[in-house]
A protein has these predicted regions:
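Serine-hydrolase catalytic machinery in alpha/beta-hydrolase-like enzymes
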Residues: 1-36, 128-129, 133
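Active-site-adjacent alpha-helix of alpha/beta-hydrolase-fold enzymes
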Residues: 2, 85-139
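Conserved beta-strand scaffold positions in the cores of enzyme catalytic domains, especially
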Residues: 7-9, 81, 110-112
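Alpha/beta-hydrolase-fold catalytic nucleophile elbow
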Residues: 11, 64-67, 84, 114
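Gly/Ala-rich beta-loop-alpha elbow adjacent to hydrolase catalytic centers
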Residues: 40-49
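Conserved hydrolase catalytic core segment
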Residues: 51-61, 70-71
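Short beta-strand/loop motif that positions the catalytic acidic residue
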Residues: 77, 83-85
Length: 155
């Protein structure tokens, strides 16, 4: 938001994106002045965002995956894709993450947040099974926001 990016957080039933996968449908009509649309999410929310993106490639410009992967084939979608995870993430299934890279466009930008963990992308506290972060959640989120601003050509 500091870089002029409209950020819309969509409230999900029980905080689970899987319970309302099409919640983003009504967002563009509420912000008609916006011309470039990206969808993204963290963990399961990222996986659901990827599934949504695969079905709405004509309406979106890109996808942001935070500690998430896409099971949907986006290789020829025309979408820009940014993926990030923390080096200390103990929740993300790295084998599945690596295996599902095949579903992303070849020019996908990937960032590993050094010292970051799974929960560091959010504001919900420690998560069972996660690694011990070396940086604060605030630092992880700032690094992510800065990297996204560069990726979106805003800096």
């Amino acid at each position: 938001a500091e870089d002029g990016i409209l950020c819309v957080l969509v409230k999900m039933p029980c905080n689970l994106a899987v319970l309302d996968m099409n919640a983003a449908d009504s967002i563009p009509e509420r912000f008609s002045e916006v011309t470039d649309w990206y969808i993204g999410g963290h963990s399961l929310g990222g996986a659901m965002a990827a599934s949504y993106a695969a079905k709405h490639t004509d309406e979106l410009d890109g996808l942001v995956l935070l500690a998430a992967y896409s099971t949907a084939d986006l290789t020829d979608s025309g979408l820009r894709v940014y993926a990030a995870y923390g080096s200390e993430d103990g929740v993300l299934n790295r084998e599945k993450y690596e295996a599902d890279r095949i579903n992303l466009p070849q020019d996908t930008t990937e960032t590993v947040i050094d010292g970051g963990c799974h929960a560091g992308f959010g504001n919900y506290g420690a998560q069972k099974g996660d690694g011990a972060p070396v940086i604060s959640a605030e630092e992880q989120q700032q690094q992510t926001a800065d990297a996204l601003a560069v990726w979106m050509n805003l800096q």
